[in-house]
């Protein structure tokens, strides 16, 4: 792992001691720091009111809170998530990282009786570039969903939020996100809140001023798909206590509130999931992503499908498929996927990446991957030569490989 260029995700449940009420919570690493952190335990550790009301509760974590009420016992907690699928399996020390990794998790949120899944992935696009994929689906078991709130916290001093095309969202001060809405008191720990009601795709940029270090400011770039009946917020949250004791941080963590982005989906968030791309970058190592757009599966019956197109500045184009049911098939512009997750890239500079996650079929221009049983298959072209990793036998009668392939 390269300390500056590698990417890493931490996904947290609530099974065992010293646990928080956080659902499926994640942390993101980038450019040498935990950029998207867990909040920690507060100024007065486990005995403090701030721990009981905020630091141990959903809104302090990078997760989704349902109807403003998601919670359950903390410290000793028995609310784990289920691992539905992942790639790769736990590796032996020293093994190289694959260019695509992912996990698909399920969680039952007990307070609201909601079903939640979170599919997260790392896609490496070059020796020093890559991005995170996040698809979070959430809905109440018996309907009647009021709203689902997606929280993301990031280090830094400034946060900008615009439409994905750069246009102004006209954010306005708001008193939403508060205990007064019959929500958790943790909401009232947020302040300097601004909101825009919009169905547009949005782009958030979190900036860490590195003037006291090397002057190479660090950014976390966040793209999120827009949906009807959605609001987006910027806010400030209490400081990130969990990193305040870490040496060599870029600024005094205890003196800086935590930059917070919130997306509120009114109604259910299963057929209108939170679909995001995250990419760390710096002033000297700018974003490698040219654009992020989204697509729907062709045909009917896949209302909860998520499709993402990520265009990189090096000419690579990734089409990302996320399905809630691996038994279903999604098609788009000649591509076909029957899986939880898939990444299909174009061919650029003699390179190409095709990934099938917990699936049985992937069809892309010039290539077909098929297995009898659900499998993870990574097929890559590197400098003109093909390589494959598979968790199960692949039917080569349906897999077109050039004669210069290596299997």
Regions flagged by a language model, labelled:
Residues 131, 244-264:
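Extended, compositionally biased non-globular segments
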Residues 199, 208, 235, 241, ...:
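N-terminal compositionally biased, intrinsically disordered segments and leader/signal-like regions
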Residues 204-237, 259-282, 406-407:
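Extended amphipathic secondary-structure runs
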Residues 101, 160, 201-209, 217-223, ...:
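Ser/Thr- (and often Asn-) enriched beta-sheet segments in non-cytosolic proteins
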Residues 151-227:
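Polysaccharide-binding surfaces and accessory modules of carbohydrate-active proteins
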Residues 1-173, 182, 268-270, 276-283, ...:
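Catalytic and substrate-binding regions of extracellular carbohydrate-active enzymes
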Residues 261-272, 278-399, 406:
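Non-catalytic terminal regions with compositionally biased, polar/charged low complexity
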Residues 2-6, 108-117, 143-147, 210-220, ...:
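Short, surface-exposed beta-strand/loop "edge" segments at domain boundaries and coil↔beta transitions
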